[in-house]
Structures are given as C-alpha cells and as structure tokens.
Amino acid sequence: MPELKKEDSSKDEKDLDMNCPPLHRPNGADLNQYSKSLMEQLQAQLFANPALQFPSFPPAFSIAALTNNQHELKEDDGKKTPTGDNILEAASVLDNRENGSPSDGTNSPDDNGKRKQRRYRTTFSAFQLDELEKVFARTHYPDVFTREELATRVQLTEARVQVWFQNRRAKYRKQERSSTHHPYQAPMSIPNSNGDNPYQMMLSQEAIFAAINQQAAAHLLNEQVRIATSDRRSQSPSVPVTTSSPILPTSVTPTFQNADALNMLFGGITPVTQQLLYVQQFSRAMDAFRTQLLGSVPAGATAEVTDVVALKTEDSKSNSRAGSSSPTPTESSGAAATSTSPTNFADMNSLISDVKPKEESS
C-alpha cells in the first residue's frame, strides 16, 4: 500500500507540472458519465490554459483579409523597386567592369561565392576589321586553320574570330533578304551613256549626218553619170551604153554603223518607227529629185536608158540562176555586146574617124 501512495504522489506531481488539475474517478460511478465528465474536464483545462489556445483566423473572403493582402503586396513591390543606393551601386559595378575587365571575359565571384564567367563586347580596330573583311570576301565559312591563322595575325582568340564570322554571315543574309524581297523596290536606273563623254551625243549626230550626206552625194553622182551617158547616146544613137554604173534602187536607205547613235538621235522613243519614217521621207525627196533631173533629158535618151537597165536586170537574173561567179552583170553584158556584134566595130571605127578630123582641125 505505501508503494501505491508513492505512485499517486508521483502522478500528482506530473499533473502539477502540466498545470492541469488531477483527475479523480468517483467510486461506483457509471463509465458513460465518467467519460462525459472527463471530456468536460479536458475542455475546461484546454480553455483555461492560454498556451494551448488556437489563434483565431478571419474568414477567407472578409474585407479585412482582402485589405491585409493588398497591403502585403504593396510592401513586396516596394522592396522590389530599386532605390537610389541600388542604382549607384550598379553604376559603380559597371564602371569597374569597363575599366578593369579584359575584352573576352573574366571570372567574377557570385553572391553565393561561385565563380561565374561573364562575356563583354569586343572592340575591333580598323586593321582587324580590314583583315576579317578580306577573309570574309574570300569565303563565308573559313575552316579552323584559317581562323587560327587569322586570329594570330589580328591578335585575337579563335573564338572571337568565329563569333565575328557568325555575326557577319547573319548581317549578310539580312542585307540580302532586304535587297531582294523588299516590297517597295526602287525603279531600275537607266544607265547614262553620256556621263563620261558629254559630247558623245553630238559626235554621234555628226556621224549620222555625215553618213546621210555621203549617201546623198553618191546618189547625185550616179544621177550625173546617167545623165552624161544619156547625152552621149543622144549624140551617137547607134553606140550602146557600156558603162558599168551600179543600178540604184527606188528607195535609198542610209546605213548606220552605230544603232545607239540613231536611237539617241530620235530621242530613244520607238526608234524603229522613227527610222522608217525618216527613210520614207528621204526616199520621197530623192524620187522627186530624180524625176526633176529626168524631166530635163530628151524622151529618146530616157527610153534608151530604160532599155539598157532592163537588159542589165535580165542578165543579172540569168547569171544568178546559173550560179556564175562573174564580178558584175553589167560588165559581162557590156563585154558581150562589144565583142559579138560586128556593127559595134563599125560604129567604133566611125567614131574614131570622126574624132581624128576634129583633133586635126583643133
């Protein structure tokens, strides 16, 4: 029994340490009532002890809870916004980087004490850019050996050279796309051929007019030859004309060695039609001039000249069909006329006999 008393005393001490009143079971009491009374005692002990009380939480959607959350968010934003001291510290860090940092990066300690590698912009000199551009003009994708050789020549690392070539290729592709696929392309500029020599147009026009004058002079000379031959035939009707003058076409087309000069002469607008109009006008003028010259010649002489021209055209057609390589059809026809007909020799003798008395009388 005394041992039991000791145990009860130890229990009482524990209850005192827990700041709880001792629990006693009444003798002969019901278990249900005992459990109810025990729960009531425990609840009374919990509410009586302030250390064991639970904190009171406001409802989730109450006005006070919402206002408290907004105040907390504003305080967090105020902590995140940089102050003047933080800006000054960042500026000093940037100055230190610019003054004491090499071009290709250094290892700077992080906040946690770790070494972190940082890269900085490389400033290239004019000599380095010149050498890099020369190699880029030769090849856009240099191999490792070329990059190493170039790096040693321009005093850079091979990694810097490789990065420069990557950026340069990207810039080249961007320029190529902008120049080829631009929605508003500039109109193609017409090259000015007179930029180097301002007198080129004047010289070309002078050449054109000289060619026209040359053709007109040749035409007039041929007309004079025909008139002279017709006069001689009128004096001696039995002697055929054996001159080998070329047959003139009905329309004279001047030849131009430089087509660009002709285009410049007519302003560059539809040069073909302008040239045709000019040729037609020129041929009409020459035809009118020919008719005026032939109008002053007697009718018999013009008929004989037309007969000779018809004979020449027939001889030329026959020679072209036979495929003969005679120099000119007029010369062959003239030679045949003088060699075959016996009357020609008699006419020549009569002409010579007529000329000798005239020379003796003179």
Swiss-Prot record:
Localization of this protein: Nucleus
Keyword Transcription belongs to the record: yes
Bias-annotated ranges (Low complexity): 322-343
Region annotation (Disordered) ranges: 1-34, 92-118, 174-193, 313-362
UniProt DNA-binding residue ranges: 117-176
Recorded GO MF terms: DNA-binding transcription factor activity, RNA polymerase II-specific; RNA polymerase II transcription regulatory region sequence-specific DNA binding
Superkingdom as given in the UniProt entry: Eukaryota
InterPro entries: HD, Homeobox_CS, Homeodomain-like_sf, Paired_Homeobox_TFs
CDD domains, per database record: homeodomain
Comp. bias intervals (Basic and acidic residues): 1-17
GO biological process: amphid sensory organ development; epidermis morphogenesis; neuron development; positive regulation of transcription by RNA polymerase II; regulation of cell shape; regulation of transcription by RNA polymerase II; sensory perception of touch
Assigned keywords, A-Z: DNA-binding, Homeobox, Nucleus, Transcription, Transcription regulation
Biased composition (Polar residues): 99-110
Residue ranges crossing the lipid bilayer per the database entry: none
GO cellular component: nucleus
Purpose of the protein: Transcription factor. Involved in activating or repressing transcription of genes in neurons. Regulates expression of nuclear hormone receptor odr-7 and LIM homeodomain protein lin-11 in AWA and ASG chemosensory neurons. In concert with lin-11 and forkhead domain protein unc-130 plays a role in specifying AWA and ASG cell fates. Plays a role in modulating dendritic morphology and functions of AWA neurons. Involved in regulating GABAergic motor neuron development, acting in parallel with nuclear hormone receptor unc-55.
Name of protein: Homeobox ARX homolog alr-1
